[in-house]
Amino acid sequence: MYKIFIYKYISLIIILFNFTCKKFDLIESSLLEEAIVNGNLAQESFTRSLSFTNAWLGLRDSESELIPSNINNKINLWEPANSGADNYPFMVLTAYLLDKDLYHGVLLEMLINEKKLTSRIGSLPDVYSFTKNTFENENLDLGNIIFGASEYIKDGLMPLNEFIGASPWQDRMIEILDDLYIHINDFDSLDEYFIKSSQVEEINGEMLQTLSRVYWMTGDQKYLDWAIKIADYYLLEVDFSNVEYLKLRDHGCEIVGGLSELYMTLHLLSLEKKYEYQPALYRLLDKILTFGRNQDGFFYNSINLKANQVIDNRIADTWGYTLNAFYTVWMTDQKSEYLEAVLKPFQSLNNSYRNFEWEPKKQLGPLGSQDGYADAIESGINIYNRMQDSKLKTWIDSEIQVLFGMQKNSGIIEGWHGDGNFARTALMYGLWKTQGAHLEPWQPSVKIGAISNEDKTYFVITAQDDWEGQLLFDQKRHKTILNLPEDYPRINQFPEWFTLDQDATYSIQSNKEQLIGKYEGKNLKRGVALSLSANEQCVILVKKTPNLK
């Protein structure tokens, strides 16, 4: 269907190109062609995400109106660490972009019900049973409550917060975090609650990431102090570079990312604490590079750093999550080995890692679970945002089609909470193909694609039916929402592509003459009003103009 649509508009591109050459400076037909192709890819991404959202909404419990963790053995449970962390938030983000009625209606009501029904210790959530109409576990398990809260915040509410900003979901995130702060001393004894050390490291890694970001967002010193308390243990009190079990895939790699985020924060604040941490952090990262990778530069699932041995030699689908840490430390210290580590996997992606079994689950087929593909592709997109390598781009464009092929006609992917990761990565991919812009209101018959080239960005909006609305550009969300001085790579962030600077001036050229002119960034932030007739195509070229003041 999408290829047919592309071919249908190739002739239109040529006609449009001949027309717009008279109006645009040095326009390239290949860029317009790529922007239109990107529009088709983006629309497929968005359509699939909305199909996922509607399918899971159909599984809501009739009384609580919450979604289950999966459609099999946990059909009667809402779990903060699963339903809340993985599925629900990306239903919300899908609706925010594509269906505002759904966003302000059913999905907001779900948040209200989640808070009312699942809060167990203050605002801290616990597993809720639809059949019991109360908590699944009669006895309170503080360890599992802390785990569920940390997952819900970092994996679910934080990505929403970083994209949307101030909202009821941001409020929920902060109230849970502040109630976790009440139990700060219980974090010192997490190993009493969990058999696997990787679960403790996952929680602490999630907290380091959350606390570093919320510190910048709020300026509240207590969050930074808490993060330092956690990092002191790993980098000053024990030799974590000598740990006997380090998991480098999800549910373990978070600690490496968390330590790097705090390290970046200390660097940006010019605090001496950074240099106290530096030797231990370098030892950890250097040993991961030496003993934790295969010949292609991909990380093993788990390693023993005390014995310098590989425990699980399967390749981690979250390869980019760990590389985020290396890139972040490279940003602070310009340590060349860490940048080389980020670049190395690009060389073998297309030869050895297409149709790769990232997360083996034989009952699902030879490619395993879609969750592995979702994480692996997210890994690539976030790195591509920083290192725009053509080999990486080719691999992402290839493997997203493998991922898309795993969705059922119903909209369900595999029927468990990991389905949300499909939508997360699909949205991430689609927003790359629109350079972060979106249309409001969205409708299936109107597509937007974009491509950036040097200092210019081309947007092509193609309407099959009459449409009236706005073209909305992305903002520098790391600044406007998180107040971050640097946009370092973060797990589960939605990368920024073309972003407005509200203090800059932009020139717009277009085949719609009424749009041509100069605009202040603060005015463009409100969007560009558009009205398109059926079968009309609008091209908009946006370029930042020099500040002559």
Language-model-derived ranges and their functions:
Residues 24-548:
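Glycan-recognition and catalytic cores of secretory/periplasmic carbohydrate-active enzymes
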Residues 2-12:
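Sec-dependent signal peptide recognition
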